[in-house]
C-alpha cells in the first residue's frame, strides 16, 4: 500500500462527518498534498514527504496516546492527518547551486522554496482550510492551531495563548509531542 493509499484508507475509515468527502476531493484534486514535501530542506524534504509526515504523526499519536474510553478515532485521524494542511500548494520545486567538494565546481541540484500564496500563518491556516469544508470540534481546532508549540511565531512573539491551550486541551499537547517525535526521531533530515 502506498502512503497515499494508506492516508485515504485511514481517512475513509474514520472521518465521516459532513463535508469530509468534499475536503478529501479538494485535497486530492486541487492540491499537491500527496506529492508535496514536508519542508524545504529538513524533515520530509522530498516528493510525498508531507503525506508521509502526516502518517507518521498519526502513528505516534494513535499508538502513544489513544484511550478508547475517552478518545475517538475520528478526532485522532483528523488532527494528525490534517495538521499540516497549510503546506499543500505551499512549496515550489526548483534548483539551487551547490559546490561539489571533490571537483570544486558548482552544480545545480533540486530544491524546494516557499511560495506562500495565502500568508495566514501555520496552524491557524490549516484550521481555516479544513473548516472551508467540514466543521472541527473546538479541541481539534485548538490542537491543530497550536501543534507547533514553542516553534509557533505567536509564541516566539510573546503570546501566552499556547500555555492556556495546552492546559485546557490535552489533545493539543499530544499532537505537538507526536509532531516532534515524527519530525526529529522518525524522519531523516
What positions do the PLM features span?
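Divalent metal-dependent catalytic cores for phosphoryl transfer on phosphate-bearing substrates
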Residues: 39-40, 44, 52, 59, ...
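All-alpha helical catalytic cores of prenyl diphosphate-utilizing isoprenoid enzymes
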Residues: 23-30, 43-55
Amino acid at each position: 500500500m502506498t502512503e497515499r493509499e494508506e492516508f485515504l484508507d485511514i481517512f475513509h475509515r474514520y472521518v465521516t462527518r459532513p463535508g469530509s468527502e468534499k475536503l478529501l476531493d479538494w485535497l486530492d484534486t486541487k492540491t499537491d498534498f500527496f506529492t508535496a514535501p514536508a519542508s524545504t530542506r529538513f524533515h520530509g524534504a522530498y516528493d510525498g514527504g508531507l503525506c508521509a509526515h502526516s502518517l507518521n504523526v498519526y502513528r505516534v499519536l494513535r499508538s502513544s496516546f489513544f484511550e478508547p474510553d475517552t478518545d475517538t478515532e475520528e478526532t485522532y485521524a483528523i488532527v494528525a492527518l490534517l495538521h499540516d494542511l497549510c503546506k499543500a500548494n505551499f512549496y515550489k520545486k526548483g534548483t539551487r547551486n551547490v559546490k561539489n567538494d571533490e571537483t570544486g565546481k558548482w552544480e545545480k541540484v533540486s530544491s524546494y522554496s516557499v511560495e506562500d500564496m495565502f500568508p495566514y500563518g501555520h496552524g491557524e491556516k490549516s484550521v481555516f482550510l479544513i473548516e472551508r469544508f467540514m466543521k472541527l470540534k473546538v479541541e481539534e481546532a485548538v490542537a491543530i492551531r497550536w501543534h507547533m508549540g514553542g516553534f509557533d511565531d505567536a509564541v516566539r512573539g510573546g503570546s501566552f495563548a499556547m500555555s492556556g491551550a495546552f492546559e485546557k486541551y490535552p489533545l493539543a499537547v499530544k499532537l505537538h509531542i507526536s509532531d516532534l517525535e515524527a519530525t526529529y526521531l522518525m524522519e531523516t533530515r
